[in-house]
A protein has these predicted regions:
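Beta-strand-rich N-terminal accessory domains
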Residues: 2-75, 145, 164, 168, ...
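Generic recognition of long tandem-repeat/solenoid scaffolds
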Residues: 22-27, 117-124, 151, 217
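Acidic (Asp/Glu-rich), glycine- and aromatic
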Residues: 35-38, 43-53, 145-194
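Beta-strand elements of well-folded, non-transmembrane domains
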Residues: 58, 125-129, 140-144, 157-161, ...
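Extended, loop-rich substrate-binding clefts of extracytoplasmic carbohydrate-active enzymes
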Residues: 77-147
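Hydrophobic residues positioned within well-ordered beta-strands of beta-sheet architectures
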Residues: 119-121, 136-138, 151-153, 183, ...
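Active-site/ligand-binding surface loops and adjacent short beta/alpha elements
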Residues: 164-235
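Beta-strand-rich recognition/accessory modules
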Residues: 228-305
Length: 306
């Protein structure tokens, strides 16, 4: 690993550069990921760290940044669309009484505080009014294999507000099949209409609101004659927010249909793996990969595979 400044957890062939506002992971001449931990975002867009661009080993971009339909969609990022009346997502909030979205002075920010060890980041969540509600520890690892690379990600969120926090979504507030909250990926325009493959023979846009421990999205690129696959692995029983139209998006939701209460002082932890692969992986290839790379393989959160 070659780094300048803050450490990160990467395997031997990955080089890392810290610019003071971003961590850039490279495999040779290919930039795989740019993790922007000090973003220049407006309050309305919900300032928070994000990973964009994400690229395959072949160099194809597999994420979107500030699309004109949702300016707060930025690659891959951790979010909370409804948190005790606050919006750590960005943009307008869904209001049950109005039956729609409206702009409110409730858009919070997730602030990078420091890197405390290899791949380990400390963040704090603040409401638009300046109240400190959550302390988060986020751990990341980057690992490269023959035709794909993997981002391992874990998050531990601790309630420091002094009263219960309720994690929800537009669906918990009355909008059907819109339960987005948590780790969210926005795909490039060319991935619109892509293929969704999920655990247990499931697949397609019908995965919206269904449960699975993993879900893959296969999309085709513009300009080059190539496809790419993103595989998202989460805990068993995860409910997914997924769209293929009008845009590509995947989210293992924190609170799709029911609010989750986090008591004062309590910590809520989640672990994910995102595989970025060259080519259109079929179900057999995906299932083989999941079997050989179990999420609960005993590695510590953020620990890479050697």
């Amino acid at each position: 690993m070659n780094g300048t400044g803050h450490p990160a957890n990467v395997t031997g062939r990955v080089e890392l550069e810290d610019t003071g506002t971003e961590l850039v992971a490279r495999d040779g001449a290919t930039e795989l990921m740019r993790y922007v931990y000090r973003p220049e975002s407006s309050v309305y867009e919900g300032p928070k760290p994000y990973a964009h661009p994400l690229r395959t080993l072949a160099g194809d971009v597999v994420s979107a940044y500030r699309p004109n339909d949702h300016r707060w969609h930025k690659g891959l990022q951790m979010t909370a669309s409804h948190l005790s009346g606050q919006n750590f997502w960005g943009g307008a909030s869904y209001v049950r009484e109005l039956g729609g979205y409206t702009d409110l002075p409730n858009v919070g920010a997730m602030r990078h505080e420091e890197f405390t060890g290899p791949g380990r980041e400390r963040l704090s969540w603040h409401t638009q009014g300046g109240e400190h509600w959550v302390d988060e520890v986020r751990e990341m690892a980057v690992d490269v294999e023959d035709d794909h690379w993997t981002l391992g990600l874990s998050t531990s969120m601790t309630n420091v507000r002094g009263e219960p926090l309720l994690f929800g979504s537009p669906t918990t507030h009355g909008r059907p099949m819109a339960g987005y909250s948590g780790l969210f990926w926005r795909g490039p325009r060319s991935f619109t209409g892509g293929l969704v493959i999920a655990e247990g023979g499931q697949g397609g846009p019908e995965m919206m609101g269904r449960t699975a421990s993993w879900l893959a999205y296969v999309g085709e690129h513009d300009e080059v004659d190539r496809s790419s696959t993103l595989l998202f692995v989460a805990a068993p029983g995860t409910t997914w927010f997924v769209r293929t139209t009008p845009f590509a998006a995947v989210n293992p939701s924190l609170a799709f249909r029911q609010e989750v209460e986090l008591p004062p002082g309590a910590t809520w932890s989640h672990r994910y793996r995102v595989v970025v692969a060259d080519g259109a992986w079929d179900r057999d290839r995906i299932e083989d990969h999941v079997r050989s790379h179990p999420l609960d393989d005993g590695a510590a959160p953020g620990e890479g595979r050697s």
